[in-house]
Amino acid sequence: MKDNSRRKFLQNAGLATLASVSPLAAQPEKNKELFIHHVYFYLKDPNNAQDEAKLLEGLNKLAKVPTIQYVHIGKPAETNRSVIVRDYTFSWMCFFKNIIEEEIYQTHPIHLDFIKEYSHLWEKVVVYDSVGPKKVG
């Protein structure tokens, strides 16, 4: 094979290979890193038991979004150290297989309905999102 035709063959083979790679395979970090979405809800009236029960009802509905792998709904623990924040009403932590699954959650009708139906209850929401390997060590 002549150098010129060999070079063209290799260029075309390289282009064919690139064209066959899916966009998801080209972004392995997005698919392999566990995504954690941690939200702290602060009620407008933190002493209102009805509002607290209503928000808990909404969080339990929200847990039904199918891309969520695991959910934890928590209240502040009875721990007292200077670095601990305990002024929130509920902690909502959910785990996703990857960022793509979390992006689906963000636009899912259950999530959008949750915001529409329950956002009047809170005065503030703080969100911490993180990614990392599924298992370390």
Give the role of each language-model region.
Residues 47-73, 107-121:
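Short amphipathic alpha-helical segments
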Residues 24-50:
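C-terminal segment of N-terminal export signals and the immediately downstream linker at the start
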Residues 136-137:
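Short, solvent-exposed mixed-charge patches
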